[in-house]
């Protein structure tokens, strides 16, 4: 049977191949059978698609050639074709960059953690510039709420645009009568809040929140003007920035918050992906212009000083002031100079390197200033001054960018940023700041001007400003804030038409305009305007109310600002009658003036004679205040409020009980004890006691001291270990809150050891607060000698606080190069090194250090200023005895370095550590003769000892005894002793303080020492002696000796004290200068009082 040519072969059922398994999991029905009419050849699934793709590609290339053909047809040159090609390539590049940035941002939000780890090594072009890791609290709970609400917010936006915005656009212009929104979708990517940071408000009635917001959305909004077949839209958007939300005022009624203010502290980052006709906005040049215009529109109502206010309660007072509050202060920025800038100009195709033509842009929020251009200079001197209003601290930043001026495009030379909070804290900040993104430094002097609400210091400010060299504008003495509220009964236009009033406010040559309010003669503006005033006594505010055409004047007002100077708190809040207007036309305004005052308490002005660093002033033209040409040098330091607020914590590690036995002998068959010691950690310091051998109830009786601050959350960590040859065994730990000790001042407790079955530790903690008076120093030294333990370091009697602010006129390296100086402060064996300030002979350190002082009369502060790699630039030795005679024990001034070149400004402040719970009384209570006030229980009965008297009583006894010590000494002189019984260690303690008026037998003074013997024993076990002093009749020893014996046995002994001298190097004989014998049974061992004892003669010469 013949087949027609159109028929294909008919395969038999056995010849038909089985359907292959679909790897994609599609059902068998998806595989279509061949069409009988297809000639027997099954069409491939992508055949039609491939053909369509080829045709589309061919069509695109043909469309590209059409403009070329048309250009040739109309006789245009090839330059037009090349220009169009360049325009297209630029547009394509901008589009690709936007799409790549949008994809990277979306992918980052989809898998934030994993992608961040991968993109750490990406180039800066691939990783979005806004990606940061702010030190804020996460707010995932808030993001979940936003994600849930996002679809409903999209529905609201669709209704808002279709029902409100679209009719308004159609009514605004006859050509837009067919304007409509064809598509409104917010997409599936909601706004994300990266973190929230809460700041303490300036007032108690406000709460400040910073929201780090990031929106990388797939929003799609399309519009169409059907009459002109015009389509446009947005497909994708990025918005990143810090939105500050202020809840203010807080009220006593629901909803608790009266209003919410929102604004961006700095301009946010915005990137829009256009579609349709708005694709033209991605053309290079138009792209940056359109982005700038959009950002300017956003900044006009949502970037400082503008803010969005949402009242939450009706009839809220001072809405205008909430919408535009007074500035926190004014910063006067002196842009002085720059140095070491990069050379950007090239000549002869780059073969010859030129210099740069630098200028600077200074920004704070929306306030921007541009300096003049300095031609061909890498170390320009500008000497310009700008004044900016600061609205939010912290948050706002001063930004300075330096550019090289070129005919085509200016080259970037570097930038610096500084938080205004540092200027507020310093008051005056004068420094060289390094430029980031380039090289070199810029010299700024920043002055924080406070706002005063009275005119008392206006004359002083005006006098200061006369000496300020300021350009391009003279310095301001005050600011004026005008709150323009509303007007009433303005005159109508011709034909009794309602006017469209707006207001022009002018002070000298500065004019600002309000918005226009349409079709009303009773407009409400609620706007604020700010002016700088050079001389409020002579300036005037000129107000013109006009129609929006500016041709018709509806009213005028001229107000001398001198009226404000006599008003309460420099405020006028009232109606003002308009002239050249209707009979009842008036304007309601609130005017607030504030005087700009630079706190001069820390600044030396030339009117102060003899101040180091004051200017040389011409008597005919005295300069007052701060000057760019001759900036004042401070006479005193300006430390922060935390300087000098440290305390000293004295830690007595007394004893422990019931510790765990860790030692084992004979392979663990024999159980031993432990060799315990204590480790303490606090404020970054660690201490360790001595080891007590084989004792489960050890006594350490050691004292440690550490400098602490009142920062909350600190803890004293105590751990007990058993000392072993290999690894020390853990015996327990405990913690004590430092805040508890600082608040109570004293803590004496048995603390249970944690993480072990048994054991407890006895600690005594005492807070010592420095006092700026030397009257109690001798008593403090006396008390310290009484409570000093043999195995502890000498106790501190004072705390020295040093604030190193700055240095000036340091010597240069090799005569021409600036050093990189740092300072080292040393007292005894403790040192502190400041930071290194790069390449300057006038470094500013602003650092503080504290030292424990044991002997203020004899110790010195050693200061060395060194250069990194250059050695010593200068040194200073300050005896602390000078502080003891200074007012408030403080020296705050410039000190000249010993090198003769250079000075340092520092503050040295001494505080005497007076103990309120000395511990001497606690030691002595168990054996006082006044039994009526004492506890009968032994000291180790399980609780802390009962303190029966206080340190002031001890000091009173010491003062009383010292007052009677001026009796004349006997013929052989006197020896000063303190004898008492230390009950906690069960020891008899004697302190040999010194001798006076000793006998001189020969031509030369003796070399005295003191020998002590505890009778009736005369063996070496009870014998003690001091060191020997050379050639003196009044030696000072201050040495402590101990004998371990019970109290009842000590009261049966006699203490034999002999003062001897070694007259000859070769002789073993010792000359007895005098002796005294104390019957301890007749001595009050509970008092611990230092006394002078007359030395007696003894015919028998003793030998060592």
UniProtKB/Swiss-Prot annotation:
Domain remarks in the Swiss-Prot or TrEMBL record: Anchored to the endoplasmic reticulum membrane by a transmembrane hairpin structure; both N-terminus and C-terminus are cytoplasmic.
Organism: Pongo abelii
Gene of this entry: ESYT1
Residue intervals annotated with topology Cytoplasmic: 1-38, 84-1104
Chain's role: Binds calcium (via the C2 domains) and translocates to sites of contact between the endoplasmic reticulum and the cell membrane in response to increased cytosolic calcium levels. Helps tether the endoplasmic reticulum to the cell membrane and promotes the formation of appositions between the endoplasmic reticulum and the cell membrane. Acts as an inhibitor of ADGRD1 G-protein-coupled receptor activity in absence of cytosolic calcium. Binds glycerophospholipids in a barrel-like domain and may play a role in cellular lipid transport.
Positions contributing to Ca(2+) 3 binding: 406, 408, 410
Binding site for Ca(2+) 1: 344-345, 404, 406, 411
GO CC aspect terms: endoplasmic reticulum membrane; plasma membrane
Protein name in UniProt: Extended synaptotagmin-1
Region called Required for phosphatidylinositol 4,5-bisphosphate-dependent location at the cell membrane, residue ranges: 1018-1025
Keyword Transmembrane: yes
PTM per Swiss-Prot/TrEMBL: Phosphorylated on Ser residues in insulin-treated adipocytes (in vitro); this promotes interaction with SLC2A4.
């Amino acid at each position: 049977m013949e087949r027609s040519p159109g028929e294909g072969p008919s395969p038999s059922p056995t010849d038909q191949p089985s359907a292959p398994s679909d790897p994609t999991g599609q059902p068998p029905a998806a595989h279509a059978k061949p069409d009988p009419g297809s000639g027997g050849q099954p069409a491939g699934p992508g055949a039609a698609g491939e053909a369509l793709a080829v045709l589309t590609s061919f069509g695109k290339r043909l469309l590209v050639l059409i403009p070329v053909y048309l250009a040739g047809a109309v006789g245009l040159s090839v330059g037009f074709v090349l220009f169009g090609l360049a325009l297209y390539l630029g547009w394509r590049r901008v589009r690709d960059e936007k799409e790549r940035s949008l994809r990277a941002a979306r992918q980052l939000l989809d898998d934030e953690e994993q992608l961040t780890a991968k993109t750490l090594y990406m180039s800066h072009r691939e990783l979005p510039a806004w990606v940061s890791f702010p030190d804020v609290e996460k707010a995932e709970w808030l993001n979940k709420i936003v994600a849930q609400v996002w679809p409903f917010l999209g529905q609201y936006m669709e209704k808002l645009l279709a029902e409100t915005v679209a009719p308004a656009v159609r009514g605004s212009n006859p050509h837009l009568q067919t304007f409509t929104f064809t598509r409104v979708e917010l997409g599936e990517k909601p706004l994300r809040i990266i973190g929230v940071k809460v700041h303490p408000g300036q007032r108690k009635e406000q709460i400040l929140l910073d929201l780090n917001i990031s929106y990388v959305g797939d929003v799609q909004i399309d519009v169409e003007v059907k009459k002109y077949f015009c389509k446009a839209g947005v497909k994708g958007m990025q918005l990143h920035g810090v939105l500050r939300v202020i809840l203010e005022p807080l009220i006593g009624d629901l909803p608790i918050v009266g209003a919410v203010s929102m604004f961006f502290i700095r301009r946010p980052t915005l990137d829009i992906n256009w579609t349709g006709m708005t694709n033209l906005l991605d053309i290079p040049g138009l792209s940056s212009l359109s982005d700038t215009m959009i950002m300017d529109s956003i900044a006009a109502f949502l970037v400082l000083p503008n803010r969005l206010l949402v009242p939450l309660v009706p009839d809220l007072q001072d809405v205008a002031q909430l919408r535009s509050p007074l500035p926190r202060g004014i910063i006067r920025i002196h842009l002085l100079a720059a140095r070491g800038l990069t050379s950007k100009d090239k000549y002869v195709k780059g073969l010859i390197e030129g210099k740069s033509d630098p200028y600077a842009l200074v920004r704070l929020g929306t306030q921007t200033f541009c300096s003049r251009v300095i031609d061909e200079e890498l170390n320009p001197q500008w000497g310009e001054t700008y004044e900016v209003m600061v609205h939010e601290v912290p948050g706002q930043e001063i930004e300075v960018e330096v550019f090289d001026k070129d005919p085509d495009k200016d080259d970037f030379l570097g930038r610096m940023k500084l938080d205004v909070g540092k200027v507020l804290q310093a008051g005056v900040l004068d420094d060289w700041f390094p430029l980031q993104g380039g090289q070199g430094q810029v010299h700024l002097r920043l002055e924080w001007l406070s706002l005063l609400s009275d005119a008392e210091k206006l004359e002083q400010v005006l006098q200061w400003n006369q000496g300020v060299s300021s350009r391009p504008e003279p310095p301001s003495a005050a600011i004026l804030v005008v709150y323009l509220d509303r007007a009433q009964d303005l005159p109508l236009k011709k034909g009794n038409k309602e006017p469209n009033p707006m207001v022009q406010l002018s002070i000298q040559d500065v004019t600002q305009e309000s918005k226009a309010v349409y079709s009303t003669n009773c407009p409400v503006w609620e706007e604020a305007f700010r002016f700088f005033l050079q001389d409020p006594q002579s300036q005037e505010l000129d107000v013109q109310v006009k129609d929006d055409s500016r041709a018709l004047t509806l009213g005028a007002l001229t107000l001398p600002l001198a009226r404000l100077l006599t008003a309460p708190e420099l405020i006028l809040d009232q109606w003002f009658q308009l002239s050249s207007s209707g009979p009842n036309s008036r304007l309601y305004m609130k005017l607030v003036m504030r005087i700009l005052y630079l706190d001069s308490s820390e600044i030396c002005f030339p009117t102060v004679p003899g101040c180091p660093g004051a200017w040389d002033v011409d008597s005919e033209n005295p300069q007052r205040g701060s000057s760019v040409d001759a900036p004042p040098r401070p006479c005193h330091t300006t430390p922060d409020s935390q300087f000098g607020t440290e305390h000293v914590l004295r830690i007595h590690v007394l004893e422990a009980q019931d510790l765990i036995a860790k030692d084992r002998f004979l392979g663990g068959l024999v159980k031993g004890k432990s060799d315990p010691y204590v480790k303490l950690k606090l404020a970054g310091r660690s201490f360790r006691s001595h080891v007590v051998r084989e004792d489960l109830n050890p006594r350490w009786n050691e004292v440690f001291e550490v400098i602490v601050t009142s920062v909350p959350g600190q803890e004293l960590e105590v751990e007990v270990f058993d000392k072993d040859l290999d690894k020390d065994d853990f015996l327990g730990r405990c913690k004590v809150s430092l805040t508890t000790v600082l608040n109570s001042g004293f803590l004496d407790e048995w603390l249970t050891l944690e993480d072990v079955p048994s054991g407890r530790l006895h600690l005594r903690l005492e807070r010592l607060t420095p006092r700026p008076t030397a009257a109690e120093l001798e008593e403090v030294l006396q008390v310290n000698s009484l409570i000093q333990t043999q195995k502890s370091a000498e106790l501190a009697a004072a705390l020295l606080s040093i604030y190193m602010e700055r240095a000036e006129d340091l010597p240069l390296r090799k005569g021409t190069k600036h050093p990189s100086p740092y300072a080292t402060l040393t007292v005894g064996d403790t040192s502190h090194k400041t930071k290194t300030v790069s390449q300057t002979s006038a470094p500013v350190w602003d650092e503080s250090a504290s030292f424990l002082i044991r002997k203020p009369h004899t110790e010195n502060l050693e200061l060395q200023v060194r250069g990194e790699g250059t050695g010593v630039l200068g040194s200073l030795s300050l005896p602390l005895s000078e502080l003891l005679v200074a007012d408030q024990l403080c020296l705050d001034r410039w000190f000249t370095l010993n090198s003769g070149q250079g000075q340092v400004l520092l503050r040295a402040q001494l505080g005497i550590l007076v103990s309120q719970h000395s511990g001497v009384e606690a030691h002595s209570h168990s054996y006082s003769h006044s039994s009526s006030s004492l506890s009968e229980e032994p000291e180790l009965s399980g609780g802390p000892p009962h303190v029966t008297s206080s340190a002031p009583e001890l000091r009173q006894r010491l003062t009383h005894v010292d007052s009677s010590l001026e009796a004349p000494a006997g013929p052989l002189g006197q020896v000063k002793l303190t004898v008492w019984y230390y009950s906690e260690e069960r020891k008899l303690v004697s302190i040999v303080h010194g001798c006076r008026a000793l006998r001189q037998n020969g031509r030369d003074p003796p070399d005295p020492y003191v020998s002590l013997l505890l009778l009736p024993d005369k063996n070496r076990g009870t014998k003690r002696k001091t060191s020997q002093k050379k050639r003196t009749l009044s030696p000072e020893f201050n040495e402590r000796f101990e004998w371990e014996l019970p109290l009842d046995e000590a009261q049966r002994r006699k203490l034999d004290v002999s003062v001897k001298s070694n007259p000859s190097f070769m002789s073993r004989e010792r000359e007895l200068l005098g002796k005294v014998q104390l019957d301890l049974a007749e001595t009050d061992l509970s008092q611990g009082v230092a006394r002078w004892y007359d030395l007696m003669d003894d015919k028998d010469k003793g030998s060592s």
